[in-house]
Amino acid sequence: LSEEEKFGEEIDGKQTFRRLAGTWTYWGWKHGYFASEEDAKAYFDEMCYMLAFQMVSPNSPQWFNTGLNWAYGIEGPAQGHYFVNPKTGDLERSVNAYEHPQPHACFIQSVSDDLVNEGGIMDLWTREARLFKFGSGTGSNFSKIRGDGEPLSGGGMSSGLMSFLRIGDRAAGAINSGGTTRRAAKMVSLDMDHPDIEAFIDWKLTEEEKVAALVSGSQHLQNHANEILAAIQAHPDEDSKFDQGKNRPLAKAISVAMQAYVPENIIARVLELGEQGYTHMDIETYDTSWEGEAYSTVSGQNSNNSVRVSNDFMQAVLNEDDWNLYWRTELDNAKEESREPSPCKSIPANDLWDKIAKAAWSCADPGLQYDTTVNEWHTCSPDGPINGSNPCSEYMFLDDTACNLASLNLVKFYNDETTKFDTEKYSHAIRLWTVALEISVLMAQFPSEAIAQRSYDYRTLGLGYANIGSLLMRMGIPYDDNRASAICGSLSSILGGVSYAASAEMSSVQGPFPRYKHNKDNMLRVMRNHRRAAYNAPSEEYEGLTVTPRGIDSNYCPEYLLSAAQKCWDQVVTEGEKHGFRNAQATVIAPTGTIGIVMDCDTTGIEPDFALVKFKTLAGGGMLRIINQSVPVALDRLGYDSVQSEEIVDYVIGTGTFSGAPGINRESLKRKGLTDDIIDSLESQISSFTSVGLLVTPSMVGTDFCVEKLRVKEEFVDNWNFDLLEHLGYTNEQINEANDYIFGRLTIEGAPHIKDSDLAVFDCANKCGKDGERFIHYMLSLIHI
């Protein structure tokens, strides 16, 4: 490359695709992953093709970091990373930032009950910062940290877990604002028997209540302060305006302020300002914007929080038993002395469960991680338990390991004409991307020695998919239907089976992951259980599970999908027994928030659509209204003709024009005094607005024109609460009719031609539009798990 090409920005998607595919191909070729140079070239071409056609996308750190050194020679100063040399197996320190990139999005890090030493609390914040800077996320289980008031070995009492979590939250928030690639992402998890579990459950709930208090309180302070000043200014007698006995409005304003809990020092300050001649007091007011000052003031806003729930705890809830909490030191001492630990506190399990429910209902945290079930499906349980997860909870494995993700866009493997899912193409893509993720482990660097070593030892991958909500809609199948559950199960089964089979194939050449021998029996047990799920085996056939999964129901699954799923898991078990596996884990289903946009997905991960119409904020300003691209395809699949489909889509998203609109249209606007040029300008910007009232405003029409031609008073043109449509004489009924016609109802309910029996196909996670009533009930989703 020329100097300009080497150090200029990437201006074409092809440059990025070649940077990524070229890096994977280079490392794979150099380390024996391809049988011939022709195979390597074919691999490069296929990977570029899949990226360009939005069939698959790797996780964000791959886009940020992979290939910057290989393609452009970019190095950068070392950032304290480590890697295992793939040729020697030796742990080495990275000499620059990009020769070994950081392609992993997901990390799980351990933290010990130590303040300043390596592996301890303050060291964790440094390791987290190293990850955030390069666009990755991390999670940790903080259950080893002593609780509030727990005795310290050197005397005194521990300040407790929450004090340290607040420090980590602040650190993440700072990087959040100044990071080089994306916002910080972290997961904080805690075992249910920790002494501080109650405070942890209520943490985010309490902090969000503080935000509400700041928002409401600041507005009240502003209002009451200025009501006091107004009472002072309105009193006619200058000498007695501060005398509450003679200025009764002032006395009332002060009394009302005190009843509203306005602090006395604020009231005193207002009176002093009044004495100095001030007529208005500016008090900083806050809003509920998540990027606003109120949220930045409180803690707990820079992480997802989860509690680790065991079967024992759930049984205690069902039995209405007490639940014991333990000092961390007591657990350690009891283990050393081979005795049962003594609890520091006992709480009714139902009280904790109610706390979790209330907090999650209020602020969506904490989430639940089912510790027993997770560990029963753990491929490497002899090497230790799974304690936590990455920020989005799709990756669960041993502490101090990492996972790099990629997701396949399922819609790209579905043929709308034949209404068949291409399992052969899907399987081929899974194989190629399993190789890409394995190569990414080979070339990667990591934020600590422990993570570098353990990622080399276990080589965990995270291949998944996205857009299943759109796929099901295109198939004409409701998301909460039994058929949807079976199809989702079969596609997930094929994903896991083909990926683990590819891992076994790589193991036959490259050897299994270094810790495989120690975990062989357990990993093969897990693989056999996956195979049983593909065959929908009876519960008693599963090995080592207390809660068995729902298998693929052959009554609802297309035979060709079921057969493909069963065939690949037969191969996994057979090949795994022969060769072992190159990777301790191969698949996850990630939320795909960012890469879902890259692949132009209508739905993310395994989720249904949350709304048929979305409003996308554009980087250059403005907003774009987008309908789920699968709606017209689904209507065709359900038998509606093109005219009917167009009318249904217009009902949902609107016509986007004044022409033909009831109530408010080109003709009526011209009669009200607007010119053709102004109407044309307004119509060109309809896609950036959500209602006629927000579109037809003095700022959009022109303030001078409003004053001179439409007779709007000057004091109104800058008033955000002024309604120009009302001023022009339009009624609420006319405005509502125009909104429905131009901007759409945002729901398919009530659309012309649509059959009631077809509505379920278009159901979303939320009610759609102001008139929508239907949504996917949360219990139906749970039933189909």
Indicate residue ranges for each PLM-predicted region:
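Extended catalytic cores of very large enzyme megasubunits
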Residues: 1-783
